[in-house]
Amino acid sequence: MTDFGGEDLFGRGDYSFWSRLFRPASESLVEAAAISVGARVLDVAAGDGNTAIAAANVGANVTAVDPSPAQIERGRHRSEGSPVRWVLALGERLPFADGSFDHALDTFGDNLDEPTARPALEEMARVVRRGGVIGFTRWTREGFNRDWAELEERFLTGGSEGSSSPLLGTEPTVTAAVAPFSTDVEIIRQTLSIAWSSADSFTDALIAQDPYLHDLHRQLPPTRWGAFTDELRGLVHKWNSHATGGLRLEFPYLRVVVKTLPDGHGGGR
C-alpha cells in the first residue's frame, strides 16, 4: 500500500485478479452485517470496491476509503452509478468524526495486518456509532494460506522460517482484540474456493498479476526469484484438490461481525 509519499503498490500488477475471486466474501460479509437501506456504511481498505458495491446494492449510503490512488480510480470506475463516495485515506488514520457511520467493514485489508492491526481496528470502532456494527474478514494460517505466507516470509528474511500467526487470524485473538468495545462477537469460519483450468495456468496468472508478487520480484535477485516461483508452483500443486486436471484451491478465513457496546468505544449520534 502507498504511504501517500511512496510508490503505490497497486499501481503494479492487476488486483482485479484477486478482486473477482474475493467477491463472494464481500457479499457474505455485507449480508452477515445486516446492512439495510439507508445505512451509513464505511468500507475500509476498500480496494477496487467489492464490499462497497455489495453494500450499495442493498441500498446503503457508502463511503469507501483506500490508501492506493490506483485502487481509488478503479473503484470509482467500477461503482459508477452507485451511491459510493471514494476517499483516499489510511485505515489506521480515518478522516471522519466519531460515530459517523452505522457500519464499518473491512474485507482482507492490509491495515488489519501487523503492525497497524490494533490502531486500524480502534479507528473502525471510533467512527462507528454506539451500538453500531464492525465487520471484517481475515485469513487464517491454515493449508495453502499458511504455506504461502511462510514461503514469502522465508524468502524475504533470507532463509528463516516464518511461523507467527496474524493478530486477527484466530478466534481467541479476535475476541481479545475487540474486547475493549464489544462482548457481542460472531466469528464464523468460512472458505473461499477458487476454480481454475489448471494448477500451472493459475500459478502463471498469479505470478503475472498479483501486486504483492510484483513487489517481491523487485526485491529478490533473479536466482532467488526463480527459486521462489518454483516453490510457489509446487505449493499450488500440493494444495490442489481437483481430481481431474483442473484446479480447486481453498482459502480458509474468519468472518467477524462485532456489535459495539451502546456505551462503549467511539462517539454517538
Please state what every model-predicted region is.
Residues 4, 22, 48, 168, ...:
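Conserved Class I S-adenosyl-L-methionine
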